[in-house]
Amino acid sequence: MGQKVHPVGIRLGVVKRHNANWYANPKQYAEYLLKDLQVREFLTKKLKNAMVSNILIERPSGAAKVTISTARPGIVIGKKGEDIEKLQRELTNIMGVPAQVSINEIDRPDLDARLVAEAIASQLEKRVMFRRAMKRAVQNTMRAGAKGIKVEVSGRLGGAEIARTEWYREGRVPLHTLRADIDYATMRAETTYGTIGVKVWIFRGEILGGMKQVMNPAPAEERPAKRGRGRGEGQERRGRRGDRAADKGE
């Protein structure tokens, strides 16, 4: 039986970045890795309602930098930046070096696989029908501009005695194309009938420039002004018609 490789792991160094960027001596590697896991676990619990998608950890010499990608930056920053300052102190205690926290806002959360999976899991825990939750997620993601999406849920769906797996797919999800920008995430929904697993694949287009384009993305182009009947243009046209009617009357 064929098995699928992790869509993000196979693309690391091709069109995907690692979630941790640092170098260490062989003796320090295990220590750094353990602290990274502790930081991720701490932030996941503390920022549970902040819609956090990704946590990037970097270790410049004698310091640490943590970049949090979230759809709700206001919850992380807090009033007048109080929460983020407290967060920096707590991360400094965990990592043992001065930690700097920066926020990366997610403009379109419907194109983020982790946030979509979280939304589906949250609905399942609130006893929303799994088919409705899946179809709603697929529609919202395709409406946001995705090229394709696949959603899969498995477990005792609808309280059934026997666990099963169901999935929906719309558009293209080319898992074998390495230049394809595939975002993948898994979540667990703890329901009264047991645990339901949620998997989401989102195809956001192809990255033709490789890692150079990922590390140095091109600035977003400004949209050209729409040509149409604006209020001023319409008034001007109506004015011209009025002038013509007045000329004919004369």
UniProtKB/Swiss-Prot annotation:
Region (Disordered): 215-250
Comp. bias (Basic and acidic residues): 220-250
GO CC list: cytosolic small ribosomal subunit
Superkingdom of the source species: Bacteria
SMART domains attached to this UniProt entry: KH
Keyword field: Ribonucleoprotein, Ribosomal protein, RNA-binding, rRNA-binding
SUPFAM superfamilies: Prokaryotic type KH domain (KH-domain type II) (SSF54814), Ribosomal protein S3 C-terminal domain (SSF54821)
Biological process terms in GO annotation: translation
KH type-2 domain: residues covered: 39-107
Similarity section: Belongs to the universal ribosomal protein uS3 family.
Subunit description: Part of the 30S ribosomal subunit. Forms a tight complex with proteins S10 and S14.
Function: Binds the lower part of the 30S subunit head. Binds mRNA in the 70S ribosome, positioning it for translation.
Name used for this protein in its record: Small ribosomal subunit protein uS3
Organism: Acinetobacter baumannii (strain SDF)
Gene behind the chain: rpsC
